[in-house]
Amino acid sequence: MTEKNQTVVSEFVLLGLPIDPDQRDLFYALFLAMYVTTILGNLLIIVLIQLDSHLHTPMYLFLSNLSFSDLCFSSVTMPKLLQNMQSQVPSIPYAGCLTQMYFFLFFGDLESFLLVAMAYDRYVAICFPLHYTTIMSPKLCFSLLVLSWVLTMFHAVLHTLLMARLCFCANTIPHFFCDMSALLKLACSDTQVNELVIFIMGGLILVIPFLLIITSYARIVSSILKVPSAIGICKVFSTCGSHLSVVSLFYGTVIGLYLCPSANNSTVKETIMAMMYTVVTPMLNPFIYSLRNKDMKGALRRVICRKKITFSV
C-alpha cells in the first residue's frame, strides 16, 4: 500500500452503533442494564463458588475463571461504548485503542481455552467416573489454567505488537471498539504479515479448540450409546447442556463473523454480530449456568440460609 497519505494518528474516532439519535437514550439505558447484569451475574457465580465448599471441584474452578473472563471481556468494550454514546466526539487515544485491542483478544481467547478445559472435564467425568479425581488432579487443573493464560497472553501481545508497527491513513473506525480487522483497513503500511498471522493464529486459537470440544462431546455421546439408558442420557444433558449452550453462543457468532465472512456482510451486520459475543453472550452465561445447574441453585440457597442464620443471631 502507498504511504503518500500517511498521517500521524494520535487518536481514533469510533463511529459506534448505527442508532437513530432519537433512540440513543433508550439504547444507552438498555446497554447499561445489560452491562450491570453481566457484572452482577458473573460476580455472583464467582462468589458462590468461593463461598460454597461443595463447588470446590475442577468443573467449578474452570467456571469461576470463565465468569471472570466474561466479566472482563464485557468490561473491555462496554464502558467505552457507554461513554461514547453520551459524547459529542466518540474518540479513543491511540494507546488506548491498542490497549483495548490487547485485552479484547486476551479475554476472548481465554474464554476459548477455558471452554476446552471444561469440555475435557465433562469427558473425564462421564467416560471415566471412577478415575475422575485421579485424572483431574489439582496439578492438572492448575496446569490447564496456567497454559490457557500464558497462550492467550502470547497471542494478544503478538497481534498488538504487529499492529503497533503499522502507520494509518485515517482514524475513523466504523465500529464500537478497536476491532483488529477494522484497524487493518485503515493502515497505510503493508499488512500482509498481520493478515498471515491472523490466519494462522486464528486456526490455532479458534478452530483447534472448537474441534477439541467437538471431539470431547463426540466421545461422550459414543460412550453413552454403548450402554444406552434413560439415566445415562439424562446425565449427559444435565451435566453438558449448559456448557454446550455457551459453546454454541460463543463459537457460533465468532466463527460466523471471522472465519466464515461473507462478501455481503455489511458494517451494520458485522457490528450486530460483534455485539452478540461481546455483550449478549457474557450476559447470558450466568443465567445458563445457574438456571440449568442444580449445584449452583443449591449453593445459592445454602448461602442465603447461612446469611439468614447469621442475621438472626
Swiss-Prot record:
GO biological process terms, semicolon-separated: signal transduction
GO cellular component terms listed in the entry, alphabetical order: plasma membrane
Alphabetical UniProt keywords: Cell membrane, G-protein coupled receptor, Glycoprotein, Membrane, Olfaction, Receptor, Sensory transduction, Transducer, Transmembrane, Transmembrane helix
Cytoplasmic face of the membrane: 50-57, 121-139, 219-235, 292-313
Glycan-bearing residues: 5
A Pfam family this chain is assigned to: 7tm_4
TM stretches of this protein: 26-49, 58-79, 101-120, 140-158, 196-218, 236-259, 272-291
Record carries keyword Transmembrane: yes
Keyword Magnesium: no
Extracellular-side segments: 1-25, 80-100, 159-195, 260-271
GO MF, one annotated term: G protein-coupled receptor activity
Topology of the protein relative to the lipid bilayer: Multi-pass membrane protein
Compartments in which it is found: Cell membrane
Function: Putative odorant or sperm cell receptor.
Family in the record: Belongs to the G-protein coupled receptor 1 family.
Protein name: Olfactory receptor-like protein DTMT
Provenance organism: Canis lupus familiaris (Dog)
